[in-house]
Each structure stands twice: as C-alpha cells, then as structure tokens.
C-alpha cells in the first residue's frame, strides 16, 4: 500500500502555521489555536468513510470500521499540542501518519477484519499546566476529575476554566475513561528527540521501554531585604537557596546512573529586581528514568537537601509533588513485530529505550503497546530547529502501516 508523502508534508506544514504567537509555533492545549488544529483534521476526515468523535477531555477519535466491527480496535496515534516555541514534528508526525494510513485505506477500498482507531490525544505536553499526557491519563483511568481540579496554568487559570473557554465541560471529564477490552493493541510513531539514531546511522528506533517523570514544584520563602543595607550574614536569600537545590539535583542525577536525568526547567525569583534580596523563589523540577530506584533516589536526595538548605539559610521550603508516573517496559512481542517489520522493509534499526514520556506509556496499561522512533537531526527537539528528514518520515510511516495492517488483518 502506498503513502502520499506530499499530503503528509502538507498537513504537517499546515499545522505548523496554526500558532498563538506570530513567527513561532506555540499551540498549547485548550486554546483557540489548538481547537483550530483539531477542526482542520476533522474537516478533512468528513470527506471519507470515517467516524469522528471527541471525548469529554478533548481526545479525538477517528475510526474506520472493521469487517467484524465488534472486535477490539487496533489503535494508533499521538498528539498535536506543542510546547512554547516548538518544532513542527513532535506529536503531529504520529498523528498525521496515522491519518494518512486511514485515508489510504479509504481511497484504496481496503477492508480490515479489526476496526482501526486513530487517537489524537489532548494536552500531551506539560507546557500549559505542568502536567503531561493529560488526555491519555484520563482516558486510561490513571487520573480523574478530582486529581485535575487543582491544575493551574501560569496565568492562574484552572483546567476547568480553560476547558470551558473551548466549549468543554470539566464536570464530564470522568466519562472519557475507556475500557481495556476496547483495544487489541496500540502503536505510536514519534521522532526520537535525541541523537542516538542519527549517530548510529539507523533509520528506525524500536522502543523497548519508556522513561517516566517525577514532576514537582519547590516553593522557597525567604526574606526580601534591601540589597545594600542588609549584610551578607543577615540574609535569607530564597534565590540562592533555589540555586543550591538546582545544583544538588544535577549532582544527584549524575550519581544515580542508569541514564537518569533531572532538570530544573524554570526558576522564578520575586520580587525580581536588582536592589532587593529575593524573598521568594520557585523551581520547576523534572526527574526521569526507566530505572525506578535510580530515579526515585534523586527525588529522595532533593528532600534531604531541602532540609539542609532550609536550616542553613533560614528558609521555609515546600516541596509539592505534581505527578509521579511509572516507567513502562513494552511487550516483547510488540518489540519483535516492529523490529521484524523494519528488517523486512529493508530499514536499519536500533533497539532502544525512550528517555521522553509519551501517551503510549499510558496506553500500555490498557493493551499491548509498541512504539516506533525515527531520527531527530542533531537530537534537537522542543525547539524550532527540530528536524527529521522526509525520507525517514516515509520509512516510519511504512513501518507503522505494516504493523497496523498485520494486527488488523486485511480481508
């Protein structure tokens, strides 16, 4: 079965122009621009024999009926929301690839025994609410309305208000939960977002497991004082306390090993002026790994360092846990299917873990799940310089297409 690469490229480019900020790609979840992107895909699908549905959290389902439509669906997908000042491939690649496969099946009148379901998950990125993979977590029953009620964006807007602004009802969120018996399996195609495939000269990454993050906010209260009149030994500098903790987090991740990584992605200091000792500081902390004990050791060390820094500098420090996801090991049969498919199509491949989190990690709690990577040039992602060669995109779609059709059984 062929692939219309021009259509794929055109759709990815069109999505890249839907942004809330001129001259860059920023499309956060539950915004007017996010809805515009979803509606563009919906309008295209209306031209084909596909059923279209959005659930109460905003996940989009595009379904092609199977010959035995009562059977569980072979599902696949990704997301289309972005980080701030994003690249154009993270998320849209897997979503558009899945859409292209459905459109080709419709155009070529190919029927499968099992139904096919493309899922475009809402709010995969943590950029708006500091809470990642929101749509898949709700759909898979990992979080519910009560857990989400405390989420706020940087403007202080709650998730319920953000949803209402785009016509969704937060009180219906729990209705989005799906049952495991509805799915035969799930696949996600994604850019690697790291340099390994390019460095190794491989076209396809066969993912064995997905690292999961611990995310937390550290809130540090000190004493705002005059920068000239307050002697150094009288200060309770919240920013310096935050700086100490940031460096401690870095050291802990290095010591933990097992490819554990930790990031302080943002430091906010208040009042944020030159002539005042900072009286308040806030850190956004992201700790990831596939090795649970190693990852958790970084968080434990952070807690220990908080006690030390608090006492040393006379600070009040609160550690607020936002989320703690579990790393996922993907089923061997799904890994083998993807590897064998890549080999059969003549593509070189690398067996590898995913350092980034993905919606696939939550789908893996519902059904057998596989994940396919293609190279990211220089390993760059979450950046306008993010790039993947179109020939690699074509290869990834062909591998995805073949594993889907094997699972769905062409009639």
Curated annotation (Swiss-Prot):
Keyword Nucleus annotated: no
A GO term, aspect molecular function: hydrolase activity, acting on carbon-nitrogen (but not peptide) bonds, in linear amidines
EC class (word): hydrolase
Keywords (A to Z) from UniProt: Hydrolase
Gene3D superfamilies found in the cross-reference section: 3.30.70.360, Zn peptidases (3.40.630.10)
Record has Cell inner membrane as a keyword: no
EC numbers: 3.-.-.-
Domain of life: Bacteria
Disulphide connectivity of cysteines: none
Annotated InterPro entries: Amidase_Cbmase, ArgE/DapE_CS, Bact_exopeptidase_dim_dom, Peptidase_M20, Peptidase_M20_dimer
Protein family: Belongs to the peptidase M20 family.
NCBIfam families, per database record: hydantase, PRK09290.1-5
Stated name of the protein: Uncharacterized hydrolase HI_0588
């Amino acid at each position: 079965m062929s692939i219309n690469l021009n259509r794929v490229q055109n759709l990815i480019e069109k999505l890249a122009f839907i942004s809330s900020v001129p001259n860059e790609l920023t499309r956060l979840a539950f915004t007017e621009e996010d809805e515009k992107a979803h509606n563009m895909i919906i309008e295209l699908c209306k031209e084909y024999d596909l059923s279209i549905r959005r659930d109460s959290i905003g996940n989009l389902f595009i379904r092609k009926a199977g010959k035995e439509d009562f059977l569980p669906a072979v599902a696949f997908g990704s997301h289309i929301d972005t980080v701030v000042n994003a690249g154009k491939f993270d998320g849209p690649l897997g979503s558009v690839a899945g859409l292209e496969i459905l459109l080709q099946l419709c155009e070529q009148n190919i029927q499968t025994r099992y139904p096919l379901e493309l899922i475009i998950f809402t709010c995969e990125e943590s950029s708006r609410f500091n809470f990642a993979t929101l749509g898949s977590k709700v759909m898979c029953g990992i979080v519910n309305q009560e857990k989400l009620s405390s989420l706020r964006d940087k403007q202080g807007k709650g998730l319920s208000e953000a949803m209402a602004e785009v016509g969704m009802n937060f009180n219906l969120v729990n209705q989005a939960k799906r049952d495991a018996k509805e799915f035969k399996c799930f696949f996600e195609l994604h850019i690697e977002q790291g340099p390994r495939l390019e460095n190794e000269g491989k076209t396809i990454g066969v993912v064995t497991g997905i690292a999961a993050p611990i995310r937390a906010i550290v809130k540090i209260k000190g004493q705002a004082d005059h920068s000239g009149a307050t002697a150094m030994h009288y200060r309770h500098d919240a920013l310096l306390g935050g700086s100490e903790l940031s460096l401690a987090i870095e050291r802990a991740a290095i010591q933990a090993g097992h490819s554990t990584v930790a990031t302080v992605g943002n430091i906010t200091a208040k009042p944020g002026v030159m002539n005042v000792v900072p009286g308040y500081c806030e850190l956004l902390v992201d700790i990831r790994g596939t090795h649970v004990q190693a990852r958790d050791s970084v968080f434990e060390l952070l807690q220990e360092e908080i006690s030390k820094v608090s006492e040393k500098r006379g600070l009040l420090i609160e550690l607020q846990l936002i989320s703690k996801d579990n790393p996922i090991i993907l089923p061997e049969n799904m890994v083998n299917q993807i590897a064998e498919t890549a080999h059969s199509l003549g593509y070189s491949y690398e067996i590898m873990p995913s350092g980034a989190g993905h919606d696939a990690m939550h789908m893996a709690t519902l059904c057998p799940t596989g994940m396919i990577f293609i190279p990211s040039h220089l390993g760059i992602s979450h950046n306008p310089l993010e790039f993947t060669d179109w020939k690699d995109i074509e290869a990834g779609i062909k591998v995805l297409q073949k594993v889907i059709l094997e699972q769905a059984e062409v009639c």
